């Protein structure tokens, strides 16, 4: 299908040329963010305009994008948390022999060291890190389920070929850097 290859090539050529002005104007008219960008991309890729959104619902685009953004945010939090733990560990080591007073129930208790107290703070962050890594390792895309969770738009696109439909979510997950979809 020469036509298909031309359409794909045209989209690849313009994949990073986001025409925000056209999308913004179109959104004023249709009040739909995804379809406004589909329209703007279609203006840049006239050969591909008819296939840009083929099979994909707006929920497919928006919901999966939200998961991708959340995943990127979790990566940033993870990096910062690891750095905080490393700095607290250095602080604890530096002050491991500096005496201070420990508290329990906001009442003075017994002598300890600043370093020991810092290890307790660090432990809290280590538990947070463990939880964060669990969330990151189990995060999944929503996949191609669409608005109603049935993949109806893709079933229609592929003439009800369930075998093909079953291959879509693993492909989407792999392409987006995830292990799987729901």
Predicted segments, located by residue:
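A helix-coil-helix interface module used to build multimeric assemblies
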Residues: 3-152, 163-173
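Short, intrinsically disordered, charge-balanced linker/junction segments flanking boundaries
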Residues: 1-2, 175-182
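Short coil/turn connectors between adjacent alpha-helices in alpha-solenoid helical repeat scaffolds
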Residues: 157-159
């Amino acid at each position: 299908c020469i036509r298909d290859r031309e359409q794909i090539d045209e989209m690849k050529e313009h994949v990073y040329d986001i025409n925000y002005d056209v999308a913004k104007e179109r959104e004023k008219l249709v009040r739909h963010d995804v379809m406004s960008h589909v329209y703007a991309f279609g203006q840049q890729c006239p050969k591909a305009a008819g296939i840009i959104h083929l099979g994909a619902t707006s929920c497919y685009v928006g919901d999966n994008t939200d998961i991708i953004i959340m995943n990127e945010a979790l990566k940033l939090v993870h990096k910062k948390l690891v750095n905080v733990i490393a700095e607290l560990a250095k602080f604890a080591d530096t002050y491991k022999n500096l005496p201070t007073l420990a508290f329990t129930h906001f009442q003075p208790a017994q002598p300890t060291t600043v370093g020991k107290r810092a290890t307790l703070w660090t432990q809290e962050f280590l538990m947070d890190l463990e939880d964060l890594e669990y969330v990151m390792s189990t995060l999944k895309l929503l996949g191609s389920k669409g608005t109603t969770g049935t993949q109806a738009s893709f079933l229609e696109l592929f003439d009800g070929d369930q075998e093909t439909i079953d291959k879509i979510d693993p492909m989407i997950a792999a392409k987006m850097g995830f292990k799987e979809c729901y």
